Amino acid sequence: MPFSPLELIDVRLQVKMFQAGEFRQCWGRSTEMGQDGIGATLTGSLEPGEIVTLEIPLPLTPYPIKVRAIVRYRQGLRYGFEFLTLNDNQRDTIKRVCQYLATRA
């Protein structure tokens, strides 16, 4: 399955995860986003394969969206997340935001 093109986006996001028997969170800054996932630089440490919840404030939306994602890669402090189980509203919102970001590039 081909991934959608990535668009540049710079927003602060929160990452919530369950590690070592407790809930933890960290924050970061996004670097790019596509309809399938988002890249970010984080303050915390995650491993590929971990499942997290991302809270992402997006342009064109009044509230941050909350999405489940899996860590697909890690390069130093940079991470790539693939979105999991998006509902139709989340998918439409992310698609609209990516189209908006593409017009600003």
Predicted regions and their residues:
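N-terminal helix initiation/capping motif
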Residues: 1-33, 99-105
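Short conserved beta-strand and strand-loop elements enriched in small hydrophobics
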Residues: 13-19, 50-62
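Short beta-strand-centered aromatic/proline hotspots
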Residues: 26-28, 65-72
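A residue-level detector for short acidic-glycine micro-motifs
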Residues: 32, 71-75, 85
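Short alpha-helix capping/helix-loop boundary micro-motifs
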Residues: 36-41
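Residue-level recognition of conserved beta-strand positions in structured domain cores
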Residues: 42, 56, 67-69, 83-85
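C-terminal output/interaction extensions
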Residues: 78-105
